[in-house]
Structures are given as structure tokens and as C-alpha cells.
Amino acid sequence: MSSTTSTINLSSLGSAINDVLNIIVQYLPVFVTVAVLFGIITYMTGGLGGLFSGITGIFGS
């Protein structure tokens, strides 16, 4: 009885993981595009130092 329950739990866990992986694969191009755009913007604004100084400048003013 207990072995059957654990098997059901494992299979439902596996399908849940499969669903999550499917969602990640679906939205992967979006994440990559956002990451690339953010990287380009960061590079154009003078790297992370420029980004952080820009943020602190906005809050400082």
C-alpha cells in the first residue's frame, strides 16, 4: 500500500517537474532576449559602475 502511494507521488512529482521544464523552455527565448538587451544597455551606459552610479544619482537628486 505504501509503495503504491510513493510511486504515485513520484510520478506526480515527475510530471510537475516536466511542466516546469516545459514552461522554462517556452520562455527561454524571452529571458535570453531580455538578458542580452540588458547587457547591451549596461555596456552602453558604461558597465555596472555606470549603472549603479546612475541609480544612486536618480535617488540622490
UniProtKB/Swiss-Prot annotation:
Gene Ontology cellular component annotations, sorted alphabetically: host cell membrane; membrane
Membrane topology (Extracellular): 1-20
Disulphide bond pairs: none
Keyword vocabulary terms for this entry: Host membrane, Membrane, Transmembrane, Transmembrane helix
Topology of the protein relative to the lipid bilayer: Single-pass membrane protein
Keyword Transmembrane helix: yes
Segments on the Cytoplasmic side according to the record's topology features: 42-61
Main location: host cell
Subcellular location: Host membrane
Transmembrane segments: 21-41
Name this protein carries in UniProt: Uncharacterized protein ORF61
